[in-house]
Amino acid sequence: MRRLLALFVLVASINLAFAEEWMVRRQVGSSFTDTRDAIVTAVENRGIVINYTARIADMLERTGADIGATRKIFDQAETVEFCSASLSRKMMESSPHYIVLCPFTISIYTLPGDTRGTWVAFRKPQGRAARMVEGLLREIAAEAGPEIRSK
């Protein structure tokens, strides 16, 4: 019985360790607006065009009543969507299946009751694409401001 319990604890801890490895998130000490503007500037300074900005918090607030949801998930939340033509082409020449990684996105959000700062997060690419794309995403996210917490 002890071995079974130990095995269960081991498996559970491994699952927790890998549960969020697909995502990189960091909290910065600046306001939502300043953080979002820093991300937008970082993208545009690299000559990359922003395709779309999804206003996630507004959408959830607007549609929540329609489905009976009352919990506020974000104070503010936006996802910036962009694409680097050269990087995307290189990535998809390596494997056309990497199309699922394009466009690239970085999310900026604040949580209710958390006054310490703003979160910046992005999906962590896997495989060969990670070597091509993750550096760009990390550089852009780093320009949001000094990190106060990461995961």
Regions found by a protein language model. Name each.
Residues 102-127:
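Beta-strand/loop substructures that line and gate deep hydrophobic ligand-binding cavities in soluble
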Residues 55-101:
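Compact, glycine-rich, soluble single-domain proteins
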Residues 18-47, 54-57, 147-149:
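Terminal, regulation- and interaction-focused segments at domain boundaries
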Residues 13-14:
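N-terminal signal peptide c-region/cleavage motif recognized by signal peptidases
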Residues 21, 51, 75-77, 101, ...:
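Extracytoplasmic
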Residues 2-7:
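Sec-dependent signal peptide recognition
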Residues 118-151:
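C-terminal partner/receptor-binding element of secreted or periplasmic proteins
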Residues 28-36, 53, 70-73, 126-134:
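Solvent-exposed, acidic/flexible segments
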